[in-house]
Curated annotation (Swiss-Prot):
This is Flagellar transcriptional regulator FlhC. The gene is flhC. GO terms for molecular function: DNA binding; zinc ion binding. Zn(2+) binds at C144, C147, C163, C166. Functions in complex with FlhD as a master transcriptional regulator that regulates transcription of several flagellar and non-flagellar operons by binding to their promoter region. Activates expression of class 2 flagellar genes, including fliA, which is a flagellum-specific sigma factor that turns on the class 3 genes. Also regulates genes whose products function in a variety of physiological pathways. It comes from Verminephrobacter eiseniae (strain EF01-2).
Length: 184
């Protein structure tokens, strides 16, 4: 019987170690406390200590935004759509748990955006929230009638949807803000 107890302790120590490593990765990627609490089994107090140790500061306070609107505005939609397409592609080809899939997809999104010298508009926490909105059926992907790309839209978007790249808003591309797309 003592062998079973020893195995159980080893399993729990290994599991806790995995949870700490997962939380550390999420913190380094900029995840907010709500993400850490949702995606790990560590206590709130433990997460706070880990966050302070890794980030060197206390975590941001306050609620996460609970609105799909951010993902539907012009530039944010382009970034959200790029991330979600990467996420969906990886989910079909890799057998990973949801958090590992999110981490890999976000790293690829970040890599793609930064290689084009554009600042990523989509934070890791917003990417997590986007996946939650899609899983809850609040957002989906719709094919653009012109270019054929898949873009984040509300659930019942028109079949004749035209994306923000094919039909940008009138003032699009005029901003000099970091991360802004410049249209020529």
């Amino acid at each position: 019987m003592s062998t079973n107890v020893a195995k159980a302790r080893v399993k729990s120590v290994l599991n806790e170690s995995r949870q700490i490593e997962r939380a550390a990765v999420l913190i380094r990627m900029g995840a907010r406390m709500q993400v850490l609490e949702s995606e790990t089994t560590l206590s709130y107090e433990r997460l706070i200590r880990l966050y302070k140790e890794i980030a060197g500061k206390s975590p941001s306070k306050g609620q996460l935004p609970f609105s799909t609107d951010w993902f539907l505005t012009w530039q944010e939609n382009i970034h959200s759509s790029l991330f979600l397409n990467i996420y969906e592609y990886l989910s079909k080809g890799l057998d990973l748990d949801a958090v590992e899939l999110l981490i890999r997809a976000y790293r690829l999104y970040d890599e793609q955006v930064t290689t084009t010298a554009i600042a990523p508009l989509l934070s890791f926490t917003r990417a997590w929230r986007l996946v939650k909105f899609v899983d809850a059926g609040m957002l989906t992907r719709t094919r653009c009638a012109r270019c054929g790309g898949q873009f984040v839209t509300e659930l019942y978007e028109s079949r004749h949807f035209i994306c923000g790249l094919c039909h940008p808003p009138a003032r699009a591309g005029k901003s000099r803000v970091a991360g802004a797309l410049m249209l020529h």
